[in-house]
Every structure is written in C-alpha cells, then in structure tokens.
C-alpha cells in the first residue's frame, strides 16, 4: 500500500484527563488549551491552514513546533510526569492497607494521572522513548544525589526550594498566569 502523507499535518491538543471515552467528554475541553501543530516542509499550505482552523474552532491556543521540539517538550511536561506518577502509584500497591489509610490528599494529587488508560500510554511512551529516557536518567541522577546527601539539610532545602520554583513556573489553569486565577477551597468528604 502506498499512502500519500503529504496532507497529514501532525498535531494534537494538550488537553484531557486521566479519564477517557465519550462519557467523559466536555464541550470546553480544548478552550484556551495549547494545540501543538508540527507541520512538515512537504505539507501543503492549505492542509496546515485547515489544521490551524480546526484548533481555532475549538478555541485552542496554537503552538507550532517541529517534531523534535514537540517530542522533547512533551517528554518534559507530559510523558515523564505520567511515568513518575505511575511509578509512585505502583509502589503504593506494595503498602499494607492499614498504612494506606494514612495517605492524605497529597498522595492522590501526585498519583491521579496514574489512573490513565494503559494502552494509550504504552503507545505514547513507545513512540517517544529517547526524550523520555533523558528525563528519567536526569531524575535518577537527582535521586542518587538526594540519597547520598539526605542527611544534609542544605541539600533537602535546596530540593524543596527548587520544587517550589518549579510549581510557580507552571502556568495557571488554562494557560493563564497563576495570579489571574482565584482559588476557592471547598471541603468535599471522600
């Protein structure tokens, strides 16, 4: 079979949740979310424009990246965090149930995305192994450093401080700056 892929313009929205399927669809899912477009030189202009129009119709924000930039960026902010959440959650399966009762909301926050569709994530990971591996190796180096210096409060403080900085660097909800979003805390019993 010969398939002409000239018209195929790579791209996808950076939106979704750990849930999948039509029953979890939401009309505002792509509103104000980033939609990556990875056009190739052989793509006709009309095909790239049609892809842009699809993203704009969904009220998404377009970001154009080449394939290598895309793969590196999504490894950093999507694929690697998914695997870290899954590694953390997998360790919980070994924890005695009475100890799991001590878990607070923080553990749920860290592991929420580990409940994502396994088949989808197997495909994503297998399609982007090199950039993901770079992130995992960097984390392994960070873990080795932390393990070796865990008794040094300066190292622990440095890690926690850099963690705070990383959280502050993230954009707020739907791409807005964090100070443009108001937090409202509502207690909902589990």
Regions found by a protein language model. Name each.
Residues 31-33, 120, 180-184:
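Short amphipathic alpha-helical segments
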Residues 166-190:
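A conserved regulatory-domain signal marking ACT and ACT-like small-molecule sensing domains
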Residues 9-15, 21, 156-171:
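Short N-terminal or domain-adjacent regulatory/targeting segments
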Residues 16-18, 43-44, 132:
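Alpha-helix N-cap/loop-to-helix initiation residues
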Residues 1-29:
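Rossmann-fold NAD(P)-binding glycine/threonine-rich loop
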Residues 23-29, 123, 171-178:
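Short, flexible, solvent-exposed loop/turn segments with mixed acidic/basic and small polar residues
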Residues 96-164, 184:
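Interdomain hinge/lid region at the active-site interface
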Residues 29-115:
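Internal alpha-helical scaffold of NAD(P)-dependent oxidoreductase catalytic cores
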